[in-house]
Amino acid sequence: MLCFNDFNFPKEWEVVPNSFKYIDIVIKEIIGFGLIKENDQELKMIVNQAISIAAYFWPYANEEQMVMGGSVLCWCVLFDDPLDTNKLDEKKGLEIVSRTEKLLLTRTLPNNPTNLEKYGFTIFEKCLKYCGTNTHMYDMLIKLTVQWIYSIIPFNKLNESPVHPETLKYIRKINIGIEFTQSIFYIINSNNKVDLIVLANPLYQKLVDLSSLNISFVNDAASFCKEIKDGGSDNNLFIILMKRLGGIEFIKEAYKQLTDLSNGYIDEFCYYEKLLLSSLSKQQQNEIQIFIDHLKYLMKGNQIWSTKTIRYATEDHPIIQLRNSTNKLIENNINMDKVSLTNKNYI
């Protein structure tokens, strides 16, 4: 039996989640764009579960900001899903990424736009309008969104051969989407005065990288059963560590390696936070502290959300906090006795 609390995020990083009212508004949006049907209760619930994490990411945002952030996350989920699960062939996937990049960079819809492209165009234009004259924050959002969409297909290619943990960690820093998520927070706070030189500081980037890795470690542990069932275990660090140790019988040892790595990065985060703040003026410290705190909310909030959502829940999950026998919507159950992680035949 494994314990999720072995990921030892400081208690003071925990905050009460925001209201979930934005979810119904966002779902009505995507129904209006023809992305899901009004009577498709199952798909509506899946979207609900996916974007509910925004309440943990932005605990102090107002309703307008939550709808804006929730809409961008929803677009992210709808864009990522067919690419992330290899539902499309490579050529079609690359075409979608290229079309989306052009849409974002030129702020122009392509010929014969899809409903998802229309939705993406609309919500990103809302983000730009919200920024007012502080368009530099919008520029950062676009830059990091393009960076993220180009990481999806390479990340999936890790399934094609055994991957070294360091290779996975390098790609995962981008693919996990935390820098992209942080850029949504830049939009939310675009009316606050911020010295962009501070956000360009390499010590701040180090904090973003450490946050990205920590969230990816938590996600890999939480999604263990889901990844085994869906065949995505070749790019899951938790499972890779198990395979390198010799198989499923080494699950406890692999989990300790993963949590030790995470906790070491938490210590590094605290160290580099102090180092960064000590190098700044008092005004710069005040400007950047809100963004550093947000990274903490992302890390701790993601851990808490993982125990609340049915996205990863299953009655036989090896992590006790993620066991849920009432999850009937998303089928993640696997037979642990039939799991083999010594080769490609996982089940």
Swiss-Prot record:
<keyword id="KW-0479">Metal-binding</keyword>
<keyword id="KW-0456">Lyase</keyword>
<dbReference type="InterPro" id="IPR008949">
    <property type="entry name" value="Isoprenoid_synthase_dom_sf"/>
</dbReference>
<dbReference type="InterPro" id="IPR034686">
    <property type="entry name" value="Terpene_cyclase-like_2"/>
</dbReference>
<dbReference type="Pfam" id="PF19086">
    <property type="entry name" value="Terpene_syn_C_2"/>
</dbReference>
<comment type="similarity">
    <text>Belongs to the terpene synthase family.</text>
</comment>
<dbReference type="GO" id="GO:0010333">
    <property type="term" value="F:terpene synthase activity"/>
</dbReference>
<feature type="short sequence motif" description="DDxx(x)D/E motif">
    <location>
        <begin position="80"/>
        <end position="85"/>
    </location>
</feature>
<protein>
    <recommendedName>
        <fullName>Beta-pinacene synthase</fullName>
        <ecNumber>4.2.3.-</ecNumber>
        <ecNumber>4.2.3.200</ecNumber>
        <ecNumber>4.2.3.46</ecNumber>
        <ecNumber>4.2.3.47</ecNumber>
    </recommendedName>
</protein>
<comment type="function">
    <text>Terpene synthase that converts its substrate geranylgeranyl diphosphate (GGPP) into the diterpene beta-pinacene. Is also able to convert farnesyl diphosphate (FPP) into the sesquiterpene (E)-beta-farnesene as well as (E,E)-alpha-farnesene and beta-elemene as minor products.</text>
</comment>
<dbReference type="GO" id="GO:0106100">
    <property type="term" value="F:beta-pinacene synthase activity"/>
</dbReference>
<feature type="short sequence motif" description="NDxxSxxxD/E motif">
    <location>
        <begin position="219"/>
        <end position="227"/>
    </location>
</feature>
<dbReference type="GO" id="GO:0046872">
    <property type="term" value="F:metal ion binding"/>
</dbReference>
<dbReference type="GO" id="GO:0046246">
    <property type="term" value="P:terpene biosynthetic process"/>
</dbReference>
